[in-house]
Structure formats: C-alpha cells, structure tokens
Amino acid sequence: MSLIPSIFGGRRSNVFDPFSLDVWDPFKDFHFPTSLSAENSAFVNTRVDWKETPEAHVFEADIPGLKKEEVKVQIEDDRVLQISGERNLEKEDKNDTWHRVERSSGNFMRRFRLPENAKVEQVKASMENGVLTVTVPKEEVKKPDVKAIEISG
C-alpha cells in the first residue's frame, strides 16, 4: 500500500476519460485539518460509481440521509446527466445545547457526459437505503449486413 495517494484519483477513475466532467482535485485524498465546516465535506465528496453493462449505463451514488424528494436527476443539453441534492440543517431550539455536530448538510452536484449510445429519453432512477441508482439504457448496436461476394475466375 502506498503512503502517497494516486494523483489521478481512485482505482476506477481515468483522467483521460472524455465522459467525465469532474474537476481534478490534487488534494482530495489528503486529510488536512481545516476550518471548513462539516457541510462542505460529505456532499462535496459525493462518490458515484458508473458501470456499463451490455444493456445500460448504471450510476450508483451513496447519499445517506437524503429523501428522494431532496434529490434531483436531470438530463441537460441532451447528453449530460446531472445528479444533485440538498440536505438542510436541523432547526435549532434556543434551549438546546449542541455537544457535537458531525452530520453534514449542504448540497452536491455531479455531472456526467453520456455517450452517443445512451437512450436519454428512457432514463430511470430509484433510491433505496441511501443509494441512488440511475439506469440509462443503451441503443442496440446494429450489426452491419454482410453480403458475401463470389470471386470469379
């Protein structure tokens, strides 16, 4: 195990992937003590897995604690999948004394450029146990018609 994080992110990411719209952050794997509040940590770092099956592109995002009403899935500009959400702070009572605040609040947004074979009009999304699953069906690859030509002579 290396003590220095990979400069290009996790094992499944590819800096040269033309479909990724993430901005590369060289400091994302370093855990520096900062004055940033907890609201900037969990949502800014919302992780999304993208796998391609023979039938579809499947996106899975871990967003624990959010209700489906607090999450939006949209297709922008015909080929950009946008996943966003927001969790608000709890209402404070003047008589309450907080000893620790670790649950995060704030918003997040992740964007992915979909490939040409995506059927953007048939996108489906579901959420279960804090995991959002977005399924984008793929166009069937039409195999070219092959015609055998007889060789004379």
Swiss-Prot record:
- The yes or no answer to whether the keyword Cytoplasm is present is yes
Record GO cellular component, one term? cytoplasm
Keywords recorded for this protein, A-Z: Cytoplasm, Stress response
Q: Where is the sHSP domain?
A: 39-153
Q: Name one GO molecular function term.
A: unfolded protein binding
One example of a Gene Ontology biological process annotation? protein complex oligomerization
Q: Which domain of life is it from?
A: Eukaryota
Location in the cell: Cytoplasm
Stated family: Belongs to the small heat shock protein (HSP20) family.
Query: What is annotated about its quaternary structure and interactions?
Result: Forms oligomeric structures.
Record protein name field? 17.5 kDa class I heat shock protein
Organism, as annotated: Glycine max
Recorded name of the encoding gene: HSP17.5-M
